[in-house]
Amino acid sequence: MKHGAERFEFYLKKLDDLFTQAGSQSDPAAWLYQNGARTPLFMLEGLARLYSNLQDKKSFEKVEQKAKSLEDALGVIDYYDGFAKQFATDKTLPDGVLTFTQKRVAESTATLNELLKDKEWLGADSKQMRKIRKRLDEVDWLDDKKEVKAIEHYYSDEIKSIDKFAAKYESGFTELESQVHELRRKLRWLSIFPQALQGVVQLTDTPSNDPVLAKYLTPEITGSPFNKMPPAGTNEYTLVLNRDNFYALSWMIAQLGILKDQGLRSDLLGESGHESDADKAAEADVLKQSSAITNTYFKEQSLDHLVNGLRHY
């Protein structure tokens, strides 16, 4: 089996186990959410997203769509459940906000249960998993060198695309979801692919000693397990990223995530009919802070120097 196929099968096996167990639960959606199904789905989606830009676009897009449909549904549950847990201990909120949010948790869980049943995801003989494997069995996988070169080209193209996206908002963000959150999504994929690829991507071994990057190298970032690359293993070729530039990317993703969550809290209060003038002001401040760190980051051109090159073992 080619390395590319092995990477997909790694996550498919995890999902096989989850869907088999979920099939015997009274509330499969809640069980999948509570047992971490979102992570392997996200990794599978990421692999399919990447490979659809490397080869056989149609097959990989189908796999991406299937994984994304479930990952998105779990994401909605996570969104409401996360805030429901926050709101449960916040005595300053207006009456009705917690009840509204808990109701949304129940509704989003019911929606996922319908999807799981209608599309036949559950059980040891999952129809959707069979369809995914059938698609992947038809792929003419690239050899290692061609594959890693294609990944390198994809990173370069994607970085140029992200630069253009960010440049549109040099004068400042005006919208949370389509601007701040979308930028974070684009950046985040660049940090997700290395984990999903299981050793294909490695970081340089030595620090850059670049004073411009020093502010991004916080203990939380440099010590994060998500910033440790899986071992290269049997991969003959790897794509090497500059370590400190990767840390800077990780810092940006983390900070935009913190700001995004602050803005989403205001959005949810508005959805429940309880957004105050102070909440609106807080969202405006989120946009302002997001604009400031984004402009600084892209003016420094750290992302443009993320890719170091190929390594042959």
Language-model regions: role of each:
Residues 1-313:
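Function-determining surface determinants
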